[in-house]
Amino acid sequence: MKICKACSSCMVRTYVDGNIIFRCSCGESVQGDSQNLLVSSKVYHTGEMEDKYKIFIKNAPFDPTNCQIKKDCPNCHLDYLTQICIGSQKIIILVCRCGYMSNRG
């Protein structure tokens, strides 16, 4: 991530002809360097993602910063569920304090 020197906004990383370019909404652009390379990446499938984020999912209903939606829990009938979004594919998972979980959003 880079910060624009002209307006102090976050710049967005893009790729042009195999080169990393950071662009700002104000029009500024900066050439990326070797420090900005992604060494490795992995896209997790839903089952792997649930294993990777098991503790995060378990604790999500107790974190007041997570989004709560008005939907009854089919397990304990609490009148809301906690909605979290995980992974690069932005998978939506609904969880409840009782342990209920649904990845159907």
Curated annotation (Swiss-Prot):
Any one Gene Ontology cellular component term annotated for this protein: virion component
Keyword 4Fe-4S set for record: no
Chief location of this protein within or outside the cell: virion
Family to which this protein belongs: Belongs to the asfivirus C122R family.
Keyword annotations: Virion
Keyword Mitochondrion carried by entry: no
Name of this protein: Uncharacterized protein C122R
Coiled coil: none
Highest taxon of source: Viruses
Subcellular location: Virion
